[in-house]
From Swiss-Prot:
Similarity comment: family membership: Belongs to the FeoC family.
Protein name per the record: Probable [Fe-S]-dependent transcriptional repressor
One Pfam family matching this protein: FeoC
UniProt-recorded Gene Ontology molecular function terms: DNA binding; iron ion binding; iron-sulfur cluster binding
Role, per record: May function as a transcriptional regulator that controls feoABC expression.
InterPro entries cross-referenced by the UniProt entry: FeoC, Tscrpt_reg_HTH_FeoC, WH-like_DNA-bd_sf, WH_DNA-bd_sf
Gene field: feoC
Amino acid sequence: MASLLQLRDAIALNGSAEASQLSRQLAIPLPLVNAMLEKLTAMGKIERIELDHSGCLTGSCKSCPEGHQHCNTVIYQLKEPHAHQ
């Protein structure tokens, strides 16, 4: 089974990643990946980013061939350390 460190490393290697991508890449069930991502987020190691698809070409997710779920993309990336000044 993959560890939190392996999940964090996979995000680092990809730059950013969706939960489903990490699930496939690491062969971990999606519910477990989601729980691990929540834990890493709570620990301050990664950040959750909801992508804004308001610039969709069709202007309406209802008629989008990708479906409504495609419009609600959430990615994870490493949290940038605060620079000391």
